[in-house]
Structure formats: C-alpha cells, structure tokens
Regions:
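Conserved Class I S-adenosyl-L-methionine
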Residues: 254-335
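A short SAM/SAH-binding and catalytic strip from SAM-dependent methyltransferases
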Residues: 159-175
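Class I SAM-dependent methyltransferase SAM/SAH-binding core
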Residues: 83-146
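Class I SAM-dependent methyltransferase Rossmann-like catalytic core
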Residues: 12-72
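Conserved class I S-adenosyl-L-methionine
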Residues: 190-222
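A short acidic, Gly/Pro-enriched loop at the edge of an enzyme's catalytic core
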Residues: 145-162
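A short glycine-rich, Lys/Arg-flanked "PGG" loop and its adjoining helix->strand segment in the class I
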Residues: 175-190
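Short alpha-helix
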Residues: 229-252
Length: 335
C-alpha cells in the first residue's frame, strides 16, 4: 500500500520541503514562462529506462491509450480519416498508430511548427497511413488559418475519429470549440476527449492556492471558472457533468456521450519535482516564483487535499505522487 502523507508526517519532514523549494527557486529563477514550462513539463516526460511505463511523471497516457485503441477499433475502417487536434509532436499518436487500419488518412492541427514537423516526420515512418492535411495553427483559428494558408480542411461530416487529448485547456470558448470539432464528424463518428479534472486535481488546487495567497494570473476569475466549466460540460453525468450533450444537441450536432473517470496521478522522484509540476497547466503563464512557493505550501500544509503519498511498489516505487484524475469521453455523433 502507498504511504499516505498527512499534515503530521509532512511537518516531520519539513526540512525536505524547504530544500525542495530552494532547489526549484534556483532552477526556475530568471527563466521566462516558456522555459519554466519546458523544465516543468520535462518532469512529466521522464522515460522509464526499463520500459515498464510510458513515462515516469504520470500514468495518464498509460490509462487513456488503451481507450483510444478501442475507439479506433469501433470507429475507423480501412481508408478512414482521423483528425488530431492540438496534436503535439506525435509522441501520443505513436502509441496508437499501429492500431489504425491500412489507408487511414491522418489530418493534424498543431500550433507549434516544430511539433508539427516532428509529427509529420513520424507519420512518414508509417507506410500504412496517409497524410490528410496539416495546419500549423491554434484550434480557435483553424478556419481562418486554413483560408489564409490555402490549406483545405476536411469537410464537415467527413471524419471517422477526432482526437482532443489534453488540449482543450488551450481553447478560448470550450462549447464553441467542441461544437466545431463535432461538426467535422460523419454520423457515427467519434470525438475522443481526454481532460484533467482540475477541480480536485493537483494542478487545479495549486492554482487555487496561488490565488488564495494573493497571486494574480491576469484573470483569476476566468481561470477558476474554466475549470468548473470543463467539469460541467465533460465530467461524469452522475457528478453534475455531461452538459456538452445538451449544447451539441441545440447546435444541431447531437451526440451520445460515454464518460469515464480515471484515477490518474502525477509522480516525482522528489518533492522538488512535484513542486515544479504545479506549473504544467494554467500556472504556466505566470512568471513569478510565487506559484512554486504556494504549491509547496499546499503540499506541506494540505497534503490530504492532493492525496500526497509515497509509492511503495510497481515501477514508481519510492516516488512521491499526487492526484491528477482525468475524464475520458467519447462523443459519438448520432446524425
């Protein structure tokens, strides 16, 4: 069983928290938000040298990748077409690429040109797949960017499976963006969404701690409201979520929605890793090191809130961890 850390245990190792925060200050001080994010996110991507898990810093991909494969099996036939939104550099897609039938076209939207180039390079190594279109643009700008570049987007009603894997944090209007994504689907097509529940997850609680201690994200009220909105729209219906189905029905793109909660976590080899990981979400845009100070305070003084513990078995034995649950949702267009 994992070793749970309560307030008393946290106080008993108070010097470790102090040292961890000092190390984080030393590493991140003087870095702009982009480089801060790069260093923090690197903790998530740490490879397992023994290949037992996909990455050491989280089990989120380990949990959702099999679900993506199941969505492929039930949604994509030979010569089908998938659309990967906010696609990244192809590392996540690589986990499921071999499950796609021969002749599948892959269309890609990704705002980072370097990531897009890496994705395209990977796609060339998969002879059973074909490139549909590739657009270097944020999803909110997808239609305008396609028109400006001359790139032809997939037609509405043409996509078998769309992927929105941990990318909905970066859209400005969640209901409008999901509606646009579903419009691409053919009847029976699926939009597969993965998003963290930050109402109870570590990064969301770190944001709240930052704000409660007087921190300013530039728009505190909005950043807190979008966390609640994601839960209302995409969370489990039994927990007051699933409202996206009503939104899509009103927009003329009705769906059947299947949502599952996965009790995923974030992991660090030490407390400094966990403090740094607080900056991989909405706090990424904040340059002040105060965000790390309030995350350290949260871990030390409210360890139960983030389910702080030390793993004592499996490939992450000896690592510290905190809760970071995710929702996996399949939205199947009905007409």
């Amino acid at each position: 069983m994992p070793i749970q850390i309560d307030r008393n245990k946290a106080e008993s190792v108070a010097p470790q928290f102090d040292e961890a925060l000092e190390l984080v200050r030393n590493e991140f001080g003087g870095l702009d938000p982009h480089r801060q994010y790069r260093n923090a996110f690197a903790r998530l991507l740490k490879p397992d040298p023994l290949g037992r898990v996909l990455m050491m810093g989280t089990d989120q991909r380990d949990m959702f990748a099999p679900e993506v494969r199941r969505a492929i099996e039930t949604s994509v036939l030979s010569d089908g077409h998938i659309f990967d939104f906010g696609a990244g550099d192809g590392q996540t897609f690589a986990l499921v690429a071999d499950a796609l039938p021969r002749g599948t076209r892959v269309s890609i939207e990704e705002p980072n040109p370097e990531y897009l180039a890496n994705y395209l390079a990977f796609l060339k190594t998969k002879p059973h797949l074909r490139l549909g279109m590739a657009l270097a643009a944020a999803f909110d700008e997808i239609d305008a960017a396609a028109e400006l570049s001359g790139e032809k987007l997939p037609s509405d009603g043409s996509i078998d499976l769309s992927l929105a894997l941990h990318m909905l944090y970066f859209v400005n209007d969640l209901p409008a963006s999901v509606t646009r994504m579903v419009r691409f689907l053919k009847p029976g097509g699926v939009l597969f969404v993965v998003v963290t529940d930050e109402t109870v997850g570590y990064t969301g609680l770190a944001l709240k701690s930052f704000i409660e201690h007087g921190g300013d994200t530039g728009d505190n009220a909005r950043h807190l409201s979008v966390i609640a909105e994601r839960r209302r729209l995409l969370g489990l219906p039994a927990e007051g979520g699933g409202a996206i189905a009503e939104v899509l029905g009103a927009a003329g793109t009705p769906v059947e929605i299947d949502v599952r909660r996965q009790q995923s976590r974030l992991y660090g080899h030490n407390l400094a890793d966990l403090i740094a990981l607080s900056a991989i979400a909405l706090l990424a845009s904040v340059e002040s090191l105060e965000k790390f100070e309030t995350a350290a305070w949260l871990l030390r003084h409210s360890p139960e809130a983030v389910d702080l513990r030390i793993e004592d078995d499996g490939p992450r034995k000896g690592m510290w961890s905190v809760t970071q649950p995710q929702w996996v949702a399949a939205l199947r267009r009905t007409r």
